[in-house]
Amino acid sequence: MKITVLLLPALALGACAPVYVAPAPPPYHAVGTEPFWNLLIDEHDVTFTQPDAQPIRQPTPKVIHGFAGEIYNTPRINVNIVHGSCSDGMSDRTYLDKVQIRVDGRQFNGCGGL
């Protein structure tokens, strides 16, 4: 009985502890040249943009973790991220990932991991 009485305050305090919610991962950025394009993946959307075109936005799907990177598949945008050094061919910048994107059936290649 004494043990139960001693444990009740500890249990009551534990019930008041805030629930930990993990922060959202930072957005993922990728870019390409010839033609120029940008990709942003955040917790809500996968957004593909090109100059002089309307952005194509799809809800962010559950990520598929492959042996070499990540895959995101939506009805209009498919993204394959391969971890490995990448150069965009127009600057001296080196990126963390090689990125292949298929948007409405068109293939785009670039670099990501900004």
Regions found by a protein language model. Give the residues of each.
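Sec-dependent bacterial lipoprotein signal peptides
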Residues: M1-C16
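Cysteine-centric segments in proteins
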Residues: A17-L114
